[in-house]
Amino acid sequence: MSSSASCALPARYEAVRGARQFTSTTLTQWNIGERFDDVALVVSELVTNALRHALPADTPRDHPLDPPVRLHLMRWAGRLVCAVRDPSPDTPTARAAGEDFAAESGRGLFLVESFSDSWGWHPLAGALHGKVVWALFRLADHP
């Protein structure tokens, strides 16, 4: 079985809550709600990173980009992928081993790596600018 769903997210931090709600609704519809906690944490971190790092501080919160951040959820063959598209071409970088994990910020990709089975990113090409950062979750057998 394969399925996909996506939503546009406004360039405001309130979008993180909307992304979690969208994820909850989608996973429930796909009958894989038992993975919600891990997936929601990862989605929250990916969306927060997109909003914090991909949009410059001087970007108006109602920026005309349509949309500046987009969440995609894709399910197929025992896998779930959460992908967040943003307008920045900058490479996402996880905190290096030995860095201060007690700091208030900077742990997002470490959490993504810890709670997903794998993660990565790729630049967008063509008319789309920016990148997609994704996380993969292996699912138990589901119809």
Model-derived features: positions:
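Generic leucine side-chain signal with a strong bias for well-ordered alpha-helical environments
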Residues: 9, 27, 46, 51, ...
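Short glycine-rich, polar/acidic loop-and-turn segments at beta strand-coil junctions
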Residues: 23, 43-45, 75, 86
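Residues within well-formed alpha-helices
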Residues: 18, 22, 46-49, 115, ...
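Conserved beta-strand-loop-beta-strand hairpin that lines the nucleotide-binding pocket
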Residues: 1-4, 51-143
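Bergerat-fold GHKL ATPase/HATPase_c domain
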Residues: 1-41
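Histidine-centered phosphotransfer motif of kinases
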Residues: 38-56
